[in-house]
Swiss-Prot record:
Cytoplasmic side of membrane: 41-57, 102-151, 207-217
PANTHER family, A to Z: ABC TRANSPORTER PERMEASE (PTHR30450), D-METHIONINE TRANSPORT SYSTEM PERMEASE PROTEIN METI (PTHR30450:SF8)
GO cellular component terms, semicolon-separated: ATP-binding cassette (ABC) transporter complex, substrate-binding subunit-containing; membrane; methionine-importing ABC transporter complex; plasma membrane
Lineage: Bacteria, Pseudomonadati, Pseudomonadota, Gammaproteobacteria, Enterobacterales
Protein name, UniProt field: D-methionine transport system permease protein MetI
Disulfide bonds: none
SUPFAM superfamilies given in the database record: MetI-like
rRNA-binding in keyword set: no
Coiled-coil portions: none
Keywords from the UniProt entry: Amino-acid transport, Cell inner membrane, Cell membrane, Membrane, Transmembrane, Transmembrane helix, Transport
GO molecular-function terms, A-Z: ABC-type D-methionine transporter activity; L-methionine transmembrane transporter activity
Gene: metI
Native species: Escherichia coli (strain K12)
Assigned protein family: Belongs to the binding-protein-dependent transport system permease family. CysTW subfamily.
Positions of the ABC transmembrane type-1 domain: 13-204
Domain of life of the source: Bacteria
Length: 217
């Protein structure tokens, strides 16, 4: 493998990491409050609102049901308006964020559902407001589950970023498609696959360590 190709792969790793973590961050900025809203408005919860819950849940389900490659193409006009282009690293972050947010929202809701209802009832009996319950009971108790959700999300985004590379998003996906598939270079294709596997392994390893660190003994 030539030196220019090696540097291209290094840049591809950097672009893949940037797409994954930046879109993961913005995905959580959107998905975390939506997930909390889904939980607290469920029937029987602290601010139960069946109509609001059904509406938000339906929107989340709609976006979750769209395959990412279709979402990527569908969002090209919106991406161009937001970042001024429909190709490249910055452009990829927009559909990646939109694709991740509803997934994160459901993961957050599921993590909160694991919390014993007795803790919430005790907090309500002590006069805690809904916001206090969310900040001081729900989120701290669900922290291991939230970290696990973040790990799964980041791993999913690694795969999404590779798909985005096939339509000019950059990263390892574009290198694998352009130089490996189109260029019939098996060495490049296999190297890209190995690098993606390593990235996934490292993210999972770090996530597992953090979960163990925040899990209360």
């Amino acid at each position: 493998m030539s030196e220019p190709m090696m540097w291209l792969l290094v840049r591809g790793v950097w672009e893949t990491l940037a797409m994954t973590f930046v879109s993961g961050f913005f995905g959580f900025v959107i998905g975390l409050p939506v997930g909390v809203l889904l939980y607290v408005t469920r029937p029987g919860q602290i601010i139960a609102n069946a109509k609001l819950y059904r509406t938000v849940s339906a929107i989340v389900n709609i976006f979750r049901s769209i395959p990412f490659i279709i979402l990527l193409v569908w969002m090209i006009p919106f991406t161009r308006v937001i970042v001024g282009t429909s190709i490249g690293l910055q452009a990829a972050i927009v559909p990646l964020t939109v694709g991740a947010a509803p997934f994160i929202a459901r993961m957050v809701e599921n993590a909160l559902l694991e919390i014993p209802t007795g803790l919430i009832e005790a907090s309500r009996a002590m006069g805690a407001t809904p916001m206090q319950i969310v900040r001081k009971v729900l989120l701290p108790e669900a922290l291991p589950g939230l970290v696990n959700a973040a790990t799964i999300t980041l791993i999913t985004l690694v795969g999404y970023s590779a798909m985005g590379g096939a339509v000019g998003a950059g990263g390892l996906g574009q290198i694998g498609y352009q130089y490996g598939y189109i260029g019939y270079n098996a060495t490049v294709m296999n190297t890209v696959l190995v690098l993606l596997v390593i990235l996934v392994y490292l993210i999972q390893f770090a996530g597992d360590r953090i979960v163990r660190a925040v899990t209360r003994k």
